[in-house]
């Protein structure tokens, strides 16, 4: 029933108009699984390799024809006849065939597309929704969304150094209510920005990309939007940021060009400390550069009462993450499927986080598609948090809509907790 019968890959476009890989996996029962691979803009240097046709003129060298060819001509013959329900075996076969540490032979985009499509095909063969197939009866926690409503850094053409300014509707009782609260704040933010004479064009992840004078001005606009929407900041809605500090770390200094500041590691932590004292910030992602391990240790000691999320520093890699655990760096990990390049390795990283008390945030990438795999994954592993952009652009909203459907499907079995009650209670 779940024996793999056919594997087909193609080149499609992502939300930035760049090519990406889409894969279909068919089983002997007629089941089909389809998956599209996302792509990042601010990327960790140790991420699995996204194979692109750099020497070709097609798509300005960004094509993925070679990755597609690798699926159709190398991976397909390798896994046809295997059991789609044996995810680990399928993934291991591809990893062995690739044989490189960063998946540079076949391409992480080729391997991941097949990996995710295989899981979907198996779920379809058994007649289960994806979240149920991946998580069994235990997967029933809807994740609290971290909504990126102002974009800066590599995600927008403005002078904001911080890449993402996010709201977290921690006062919501359901996923549907969380989405509504976020949408209401987003709508009010648009009105506030318009009134202030700012552009309301959106960035890669659907958030507004105004050319504000300082990072703090972004916080002020968001606080005003929360109030205008009828909510209380710190109680109903809290704040989070993704600094993506590797992008503005130059020769060991943190260059906040928008504010004309050049800061040492300690001064950068001081900067965050000041912002935390002024605003209900409960989570900071990539507050320091990926190579600043000593700085991360200092930041964890000083700011460890809030959530400190490692993205570029951990890159969803179990071995690198284990190093961070041993050093006591951060207290949370951002999980991006394409950073490591297979579902099996992603699940290993999530399991490691749970065993060592790190929180888990399932995340999209800035270059996305309509694929909603991460919504099902977040519920399946009871991650408790998801980061999938703003309340605009179909590539972002598709994930929120899928969470609403899953919540409806779970019915009374659905739960919706928040990992931030303890943090915000201590700030009252």
From Swiss-Prot:
Binding residue positions for Mg(2+): 242, 285, 311
Origin superkingdom: Bacteria
Any one annotated GO CC term: extracellular region
Subcellular location(s) of the protein: Cytoplasm; Secreted; Cell surface
SMART domains for this protein: Enolase_C, Enolase_N
Keyword Chloroplast (UniProt): no
Key word Secreted present: yes
Pathway annotation: Carbohydrate degradation; glycolysis; pyruvate from D-glyceraldehyde 3-phosphate: step 4/5
Keywords: Cytoplasm, Glycolysis, Lyase, Magnesium, Metal-binding, Secreted
Classification via InterPro entries: Enolase (IPR000941), Enolase-like_C_sf (IPR036849), Enolase-like_N (IPR029017), Enolase_C (IPR020810), Enolase_CS (IPR020809), Enolase_N (IPR020811)
Pfam families: Enolase_C (PF00113), Enolase_N (PF03952)
Entry GO MF terms: magnesium ion binding; phosphopyruvate hydratase activity
Active-site annotation: 205 (proton donor), 336 (proton acceptor)
EC identifiers of the protein: 4.2.1.11
Note describing how the cofactor binds: Binds a second Mg(2+) ion via substrate during catalysis.
Catalysis: reaction(s): (2R)-2-phosphoglycerate = phosphoenolpyruvate + H2O
Enzyme class per UniProt: lyase
Binding, (2R)-2-phosphoglycerate: 163, 336, 365-366, 387
GO biological process: glycolytic process
Cofactor(s) the protein needs: Mg(2+)
Similarity section: Belongs to the enolase family.
Function: Catalyzes the reversible conversion of 2-phosphoglycerate (2-PG) into phosphoenolpyruvate (PEP). It is essential for the degradation of carbohydrates via glycolysis.
Protein name from the UniProt record: Enolase
Organism the protein comes from: Desulfatibacillum aliphaticivorans
Gene responsible for this protein: eno
């Amino acid at each position: 029933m779940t024996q793999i019968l056919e594997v087909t890959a193609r080149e499609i476009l992502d939300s930035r108009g760049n090519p990406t890989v889409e894969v279909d996996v068919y089983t002997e029962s007629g089941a089909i699984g389809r998956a599209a691979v996302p792509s990042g803009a601010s990327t960790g240097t140790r991420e699995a390799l996204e194979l692109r046709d750099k020497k070709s003129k097609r798509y300005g060298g960004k094509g993925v024809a070679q990755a597609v060819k690798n699926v159709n001509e190398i991976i397909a013959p390798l896994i046809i006849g295997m059991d789609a329900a044996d995810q680990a075996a399928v993934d291991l076969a591809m990893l062995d065939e690739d044989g490189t540490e960063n998946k540079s032979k076949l391409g992480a985009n080729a391997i991941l597309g097949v990996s995710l499509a295989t899981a979907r095909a198996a779920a379809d063969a058994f007649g289960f929704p994806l979240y149920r197939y991946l998580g069994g009866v235990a997967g029933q926690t809807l994740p609290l969304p971290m909504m990126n409503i102002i974009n800066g850094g590599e995600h927008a053409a403005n002078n904001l150094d911080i890449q993402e300014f996010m709201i977290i509707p921690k006062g919501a009782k359901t996923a549907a209510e969380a989405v509504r609260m976020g949408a209401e704040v987003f709508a009010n933010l648009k009105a506030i920005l318009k009134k202030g004479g700012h552009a309301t064009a959106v960035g890669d992840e659907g958030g507004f990309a105004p050319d504000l004078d300082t990072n703090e001005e972004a916080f002020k606009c968001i606080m005003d939007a929360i109030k205008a929407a009828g909510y209380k900041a710190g109680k109903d809605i809290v704040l989070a940021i993704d600094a993506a500090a590797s992008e503005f770390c130059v020769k060991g200094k943190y260059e906040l060009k928008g504010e004309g500041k050049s800061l040492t590691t300690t001064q950068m932590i001081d900067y965050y400390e000041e912002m935390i004292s002024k605003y209900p910030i409960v989570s900071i992602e990539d507050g320091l550069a990926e190579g600043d391990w000593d700085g991360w240790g200092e930041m964890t000691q000083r700011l460890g009462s809030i959530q400190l999320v490692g993205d570029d520093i951990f890159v969803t890699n179990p071995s690198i993450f284990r190093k961070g655990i041993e050093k006591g760096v951060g207290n949370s990990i951002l999980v991006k499927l394409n950073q490591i390049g297979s579902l099996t390795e992603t699940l290993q990283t999530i399991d490691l986080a749970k065993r060592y008390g790190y929180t888990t945030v399932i995340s999209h990438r800035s270059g996305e598609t309509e694929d909603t795999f991460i919504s099902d994954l977040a519920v399946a592993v009871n991650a408790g948090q998801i980061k999938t952009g703003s309340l605009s652009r179909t590539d972002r909203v598709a994930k929120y809509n899928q969470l609403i459907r899953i919540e409806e499907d779970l019915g009374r079995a659905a739960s919706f907790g928040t990992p931030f009650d303890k943090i915000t209670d201590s700030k009252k």
